[in-house]
């Protein structure tokens, strides 16, 4: 039975409550904000339990009921008010179908109606109105309800503060999880002024939620919410929960329902805002040249930041050179240029060092540019130009006490190593530069070590050095060197250095055994024989004994063989000499000079060969040593640490004063600096030690470049007296040169086989000089040099190297190739072979050859492989009265076809024709013709005539036989006819010769079987 109708006062209260709820100003504002014609339905909410939707099983959601409000909240309120006043609210005890929206057909929300749904009657509406008792519902339940299909009905409990989303709005939580998949170049205007509540965003950077007065969008029907499995919160502040709290009061008694009250509801909702994940973009380049421009990255989404990575990868063996065309970044933006070496990233430059015109080169074939910005507007801009350049191996490390000769640093180049006199090479004598993403040498650089002992036969010149101590030595050594010169020659030993420990011993014998004459014993004399030792014969034996754990003793003994009656060849370290007689005969004069940075000491600059009977030099060779201090006034010079190349001694205090022209200044280039932490090198700007210091260094340091402001420069070096305790360094090398006094960089020289261009008329700071090479040459080094703030160039000038390789001609379709050298150096050959079914057009062998001008090229163009059918010659056919040998339909170029004629015919034309390659291919001659052979014809005629005569004779004989036979046959036939036709008139009556008196009987046989039925008529004579 339907419930009793409530009093009029209760109805008026409920109508006022619904008018406030459904017709609030907020709802009106949201309704006005919608575009014209927007029929977006209101969000779904729940009906009381016990009212499942018609047509759907009630077991799935027994406590849920989802209806959808029509677009106009005011219209819904008016209609519902009329229903309530009429007392026709729907009942909760009956199946309540969805209310049809009171809108025109074209303005209705685009939701499919469930089948067989009918409009509710006024009685049902009134019954449902009286049973409106919201029940407490958890947030999870609300989300589950949002996942149910919404019907086209009036949402009786729709909140006026909620702005519904259009049909098909995605689940906000799911949308947030898929935020990273949004296109990076999304128009920022789309998110500038949101017309719908912001969806729930979930990202790795989630901040704490705050309370706002906006409801989140409902999820898409059919998609479960992410919080379905979560427990319901302790207190729910949703509109449904606020109404559920008063359910018992609303249903308590009829008297309470009849009271005339006005209810106001405050609805608060919670929106979780999150920090957006970064918008990522990645661009890859593989062209040999191009630009990286800030316009390549997408527009920045609102309230977000952008991360872009630009990767440039070129062919193996080439690097990437970046040149800064323009850079204008905002504060907080990051622009980093990184070298990529496998998994390792090396920062080559960043935004603090990037200036226009700067050049950065990658060490491998890949370079990466990383850009990051947090700006909402005013993004920084940059433009970089990139181009490929040929990578090269690093210059191989020169072995200590050795040298290296490099033929080419590019791929395929070789480096040859050799050791100085007295040292032996340990390792490969030759290394090859291997082509790779980062070119490298084929193996580690070798080292040079001094051996412990050895034998030298047919000696001419050499050294005996203190042996190198390996790491696993036990400290004791006993070394024997035997030096044997050719017969008739003598040996001279020159002690360039001899420092023996107290317990170490050295002996020198003039012979092969230690029983020979003793020339020197370190235990018997304390002086060093700097004048040298001469052998009595052609052999010298040197013995060295040491018990030290490390190489406490050092010595350097030079030996040379010379003819008897001549002086030995002199020698000076760190210097040179000139001689009047290269055979060093009696009267020869030798003059010595020292290398820059060294001075002569311990001997004269000139010596002479004297004594005819036993020639010798009138004095010992001098020594060239790096001095401690001095005054230098040359235009250019060298300053070395004391005792260079040997380590400096402790307790040194040296001062060098350099002076150049009055209108000039000094450029000082510190090329090598290796000091201990207690040793100090100070550079002063001026002619005396004063506070104006250009630089002060200790320990290890890289190359330094300094300029003086005056024509004078002072260098002071102090080594710690306690150097044996704290250790000491190897020393330093400094070059200086006189330069003009101005505010510009020094001019750079021209390069051979190339030219240079200058960006400014004056080489001021920021000016650039660009070098280029002539055709056929590659530039080695940086092609663009920039004048830096300290008036020095960014790098050394490059040089042009002749190109000795060809570019790869490429692959040929349908073929394979065999390359003799993967580097494609001059002389490399490439052999192309076509696959089966294809024929090669062009030369199969290409060779790289060098030209006087221009780059090396290949001997011919790249061939092509074409199918056999496209090049084959068709069969020309058969000549009349002839045939072919080995008949085929198609003939490849180069194949031949042979013709033959039948007997009696003669072939006119080429017996064999050949298929000639062409476009199209053709035969080298026409089809031959088979003509009758005249000799054969006459012979055949004679044979025919002879055959005719023979046949005539045979015919005559046949006639002679045939005529009598014919006559006899005629006679017999006539007799037979006479007997058979004329027997009735004969008087001779013979048995069985007369016909019977009965007529002849004609019998026609019939057979039922059609197979045996012949249809013939047979005659039989019957005698009775």
UniProtKB/Swiss-Prot annotation:
Residues 281-389, 452-562, 628-739 form the CUB domain. Glycans are attached at residues 49, 311, 328, 350, 435, 458, 474, 514, 576, 618, 674, 742. Residues 391-450, 565-626, 743-802, 804-867, 871-932 form the Sushi domain. It is a single-pass type I membrane protein. Residues 980-1024 are cytoplasmic. Residues 110-120 have a biased composition (Basic residues). Keywords: Disulfide bond, Endoplasmic reticulum, Glycoprotein, Membrane, Repeat, Signal, Sushi, Transmembrane, Transmembrane helix. Residues 33-77, 108-184, 212-234 are annotated as: Disordered. Disulfide bonds join 281-308, 393-433, 419-448, 567-609, 594-624, 745-787, 773-800, 806-848, 834-865, 873-915, 901-930. Residues 56-66 have a biased composition (Basic and acidic residues). The chain crosses the membrane at residues 959-979. Residues 147-161, 176-180 are annotated as: O-glycosylated at one site. Its main location: endoplasmic reticulum. It is found in: Endoplasmic reticulum membrane. Residues 29-958 are extracellular. Residues 138-162 have a biased composition (Polar residues). O-glycosylated. May contribute to specialized endoplasmic reticulum functions in neurons. This is Seizure 6-like protein. It comes from Homo sapiens. The lineage of its organism: Eukaryota, Metazoa, Chordata, Craniata, Vertebrata.
